[in-house]
UniProtKB/Swiss-Prot annotation:
Protein name per Swiss-Prot or TrEMBL: Gamma-glutamyl phosphate reductase
Location in or out of the cell: Cytoplasm
Species assigned in the record: Koribacter versatilis (strain Ellin345)
Pfam annotation, one family: Aldedh
One BP annotation, GO: L-proline biosynthetic process
Length: 409
């Protein structure tokens, strides 16, 4: 099938998927989970072929890699989505007008949801599960490095007994034109979600005529305030930077209050270096960390999402300078303040203009499952149509049901 034919098939499937009962959707998800468990070796073989052909290493290879444990996690994720409440048909509000009209606002599927993503085959199953549970047809355009893994997974999903014909479409990853056609498919596709690096997201935002929900890019900050518990700060900074550095909710920048910088900067820089982190710093950081392996930060560093074991450190005068720096340089993803000062914390929570703001906790919690939403399509860093974890409820829109008894205006 051509790209156009696949998009048209998804459009035809959308109303069929939207009409599926909760029981039918859950049965599909559970059946797919069982099949994934049963066909683990087939999926691993496809993934091994991708790994051999890709030539990737480091964090990029890790994103592409599937293991028996990761495949089991994919299947378990489908079971978790099946256990979640169905958002479709949920009553958001209802009221009666003085003229007797009864109005009800209800959740409905978006229709056809497309996702453009890089070499992460686990995303394929996550998105299929979320799309089905929220009553949407789905169009997938993964990275060329994961082409065999994605083809295997979509083939398995599409063959699930009871799956509406055309509900899951995989576009040709070797054909760059497929992305161009997808981005211009207004009327066939209701929304595109680009999930990946800043370059991919910006390309889709600038070129798509289909509505776009931005996700992913995470230049996340931690600010250690003057009243911070420094042992707590150590734990949070190391977790946020090193636990999984290649993901979007990993911290990339550390801001330290000047009042504690003399004590804390050398301490945290040593700890970061001991954990294998490349450290870059502003002039004050360099002066305070003399004798340590710290590179001078450039102006570009403050805007860069490293996605690796690298962190830039800056000394700031106070919470207001920290907020100003964050609002100028962040990607509006996740920011955290470590402080014992309630007033400073509440100012930070109110004024830091990002999707998730934390007080005394790691930025690594910005995740659908960690927030209790189940799996998610990504983290939305824009303000419309949703912000933060892009989970089941965010894969719906709303409509108004108006019931009368012959009223005219």
């Amino acid at each position: 099938m051509t790209t156009r034919e696949k998009l048209e098939a998804a459009r035809r499937a959308a109303p069929v998927v939207a009409e599926l009962s909760t029981e039918s959707k859950n049965a599909l998800l559970l059946a797919l989970a069982r099949t994934i468990d049963e066909r683990t070796e087939e999926i691993l073989a496809a993934n091994r072929a991708d790994l051999e052909a890709s030539g990737l290493d480091g964090s990029l290879r890790d994103r592409l890699l599937l293991t028996p444990e990761r495949i089991a996690t994919m299947a378990e994720g489908l079971r978790e989505v099946a256990a979640l409440a169905d958002p479709v048909g949920e009553t958001l509000a209802e009221w009666e007008r003085p003229n007797g009209l009864r109005i009800r606002k209800v959740r409905v599927p978006l229709g056809v949801v497309a996702i453009i993503y890089e070499a992460r085959p686990n995303v394929t199953i996550d998105v299929i599960g979320l799309a089905l549970k929220s009553g949407n047809a789905v169009v997938l355009r993964g990275g060329k490095e994961a082409v065999r893994s994605n083809e295997c997974l979509v083939k398995i999903a599409g063959a699930t007994p009871g799956m509406p014909d055309g509900a899951i479409q995989l576009l040709d990853a070797s054909n760059r034109e497929s992305v161009q056609q997808l981005m211009k498919a207004r009327g066939l596709v209701d929304v595109i979600v680009p999930r990946g690096g800043a370059g991919l997201i910006q390309f889709v935002v600038e070129n798509s005529t289909v509505p776009v929900i931005e996700t992913g890019a995470g230049n996340c900050h931690i600010f250690v305030d003057e009243s911070a518990n420094l042992d707590m700060a150590d734990r949070i900074v190391i977790n946020a930077k090193t636990q999984r550095p290649s993901v979007c909710n990993a911290a990339e920048k550390l801001l330290v209050h000047r009042a504690i910088a003399k004590e804390y900067v050398p301490r945290i820089v040593k700890l970061l270096l001991d954990h294998g982190v490349e450290v870059r710093g502003d002039a004050e950081t360099l002066a305070l960390a003399q004798g340590m392996q710290v590179a001078e930060a450039t102006s570009a560093d403050w805007d860069e999402e490293y996605l690796r074991l690298c962190m830039a450190v800056k000394v700031v005068a106070d919470v207001d300078e920290a907020i100003a720096h964050i609002n100028q340089h962040s990607t509006k993803h996740s920011e955290s303040i470590i402080t014992a000062n309630d007033a400073h914390a509440r100012r930070f929570l109110r004024a830091a203009d990002s999707a998730a703001v934390y007080w005394n906790a790691s930025t690594r919690f910005t995740d659908g499952a960690e927030f209790g939403f189940g799996a998610e399509m990504g983290i939305s860093t824009q303000k419309l149509h949703c912000r933060g974890p892009f989970a089941l409820a965010e894969l719906t829109s709303s409509k108004y049901e108006v019931i009368g008894s012959g009223q005219v205006r």
